[in-house]
């Protein structure tokens, strides 16, 4: 593994953004009834994995994957709230809290 450089973090950020975009496009595809939205979603997922592949060249896989997944989930929840008026119940908020705690624990390990 190469030494960490800021461009590794930039690729991780890009992977998160593309993951969020893919989830939003998937929702907008309405179960692939709008095929172009679905196809764009698949392209965004491929882009997210490609960016993650570049990020793990300088960030440990366990750290990069945990951050990618956690930030992707949290931002997708926020996007669902803002764009689609979706709300979490107390169990959902508890899950988000555990997710954040898990990110801290992995970073401390």
Swiss-Prot record:
Pfam families referenced in this protein's UniProt entry, alphabetically: Multi_Drug_Res
Localization annotation: Cell inner membrane
Function: Catalyzes the excretion of spermidine.
Entry-linked HAMAP family: MdtI
Membrane topology: Multi-pass membrane protein
Record keywords: Cell inner membrane, Cell membrane, Membrane, Transmembrane, Transmembrane helix, Transport
Keyword check for DNA-binding: no
Any coiled-coil regions, as ranges: none
Family: Belongs to the drug/metabolite transporter (DMT) superfamily. Small multidrug resistance (SMR) (TC 2.A.7.1) family. MdtI subfamily.
Biological process according to GO: glycine betaine transport
Subunit structure: Forms a complex with MdtJ.
ATP-binding recorded as keyword: no
GO-annotated molecular function: amino-acid betaine transmembrane transporter activity; antiporter activity; choline transmembrane transporter activity; spermidine transmembrane transporter activity
Full protein name: Spermidine export protein MdtI
Spans traversing the lipid bilayer: 6-26, 36-56, 63-83, 88-108
Classification lineage: Bacteria, Pseudomonadati, Pseudomonadota, Gammaproteobacteria, Enterobacterales
PANTHER family recorded: SMR FAMILY PROTON-DEPENDENT DRUG EFFLUX TRANSPORTER SUGE (PTHR30561), SPERMIDINE EXPORT PROTEIN MDTI (PTHR30561:SF6)
Cellular component aspect of the GO annotation: plasma membrane
């Amino acid at each position: 593994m190469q030494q960490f450089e800021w461009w590794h973090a930039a690729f991780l950020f890009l992977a998160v953004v593309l993951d969020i975009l893919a989830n939003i496009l998937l929702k907008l595809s309405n179960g692939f009834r709008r095929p172009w939205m679905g196809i764009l979603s698949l392209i965004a997922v491929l882009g997210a994995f490609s960016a993650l592949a570049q990020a793990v060249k300088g960030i440990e896989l366990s750290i990069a994957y945990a951050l990618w997944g956690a930030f992707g989930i949290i931002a997708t929840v926020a996007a669902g709230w803002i764009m689609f008026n979706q709300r979490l119940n107390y169990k959902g908020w508890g899950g988000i809290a555990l997710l954040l705690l898990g990110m801290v624990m992995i970073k401390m390990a």
